[in-house]
């Protein structure tokens, strides 16, 4: 998996965790609600966006966790399979090259295919 993909997944995970963490500090909660009200009065669609993000954040966290679990289960066997496929392809290529070199050497010594 690419580092950039992991970085994007990590950033999304951090954002969703921050947005979904309930505030235990009453002052922070009041400021958050005041900000949401002020933003929703200034730009109604932005307030709706904040509400939607707060609503969907737990589901996004759950989906990211499941995605990470699935990817980790799929990537490991795929890496092992690619490693063995590469090894098999290398061995086959070596065998073919060896056979061709032997045939060329025999043809050279005997004077060709006769």
Curated annotation (Swiss-Prot):
The reply to whether Protein transport figures as a keyword in the UniProt entry is no
User: Would you say which domain of life the source belongs to?
Assistant: Eukaryota
Please indicate if the UniProt record lists Membrane as a keyword.
no
- Keywords noted in UniProt: Antimicrobial, Secreted, Signal
Q: Which compartments is it annotated to reside in?
A: Secreted
Tissue occurrence: Expressed by the venom gland.
The role this protein plays is:
May have antimicrobial properties, like most ant linear peptides.
The family classification in the record reads: Belongs to the formicidae venom precursor-01 superfamily.
Q: What is this protein called?
A: U-myrmeciitoxin(01)-Mg8a
Q: Which organism is it from?
A: Myrmecia gulosa (Red bulldog ant)
């Amino acid at each position: 998996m690419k580092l950039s993909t992991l970085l994007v997944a990590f950033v999304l995970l951090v954002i969703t965790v921050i947005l979904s963490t309930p505030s235990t500090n009453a002052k922070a909660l009041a400021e958050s609600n005041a900000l949401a009200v002020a933003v929703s009065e200034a730009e109604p669609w932005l307030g709706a966006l904040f509400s939607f993000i707060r609503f969907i954040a737990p589901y996004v966290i759950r989906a990211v966790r499941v995605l990470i679990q699935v990817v980790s289960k799929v990537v490991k066997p795929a890496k092992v399979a690619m490693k063995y496929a590469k090894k098999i392809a290398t061995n086959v290529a070596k065998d073919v090259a060896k056979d061709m070199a032997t045939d060329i050497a025999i043809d050279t010594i005997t004077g060709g295919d006769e």
